[in-house]
Amino acid sequence: MGNMAKGYILSAHRSPADSKKRDAYTKLAIPALEDAGGKFLAKAAKVTPKENGINERTILIEFESYEKALAAYESEAYQKALKVLDGGADRDFRIFEGV
């Protein structure tokens, strides 16, 4: 039996976030995602955009599987963080399976 593909969350901001809302969200989101098994691989404020990319914050989080990444997003703890963010960030937010 082969190894299960890892799951990932990628959050790429399209524009600067509301700093107060982002800070309140971060205080809840980081522990919620880490408690769900997430490992932060990148929290990049330094970005070099290419091919229509945007020079904004990019986050990459790894999970044991796609299902665990999806469950982390849907968790009660993370949903509380999203409520605090309350539209304070315009992001391209994706949950995907690795190879």
Show which residues each predicted segment covers:
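Short S/T/G/P-rich N-terminal loop/turn motif that feeds into the first structured element of a domain
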Residues: 1-57, 64-70, 74, 97-99
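C-terminal structural segments of small proteins and small subunits
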Residues: 69-94
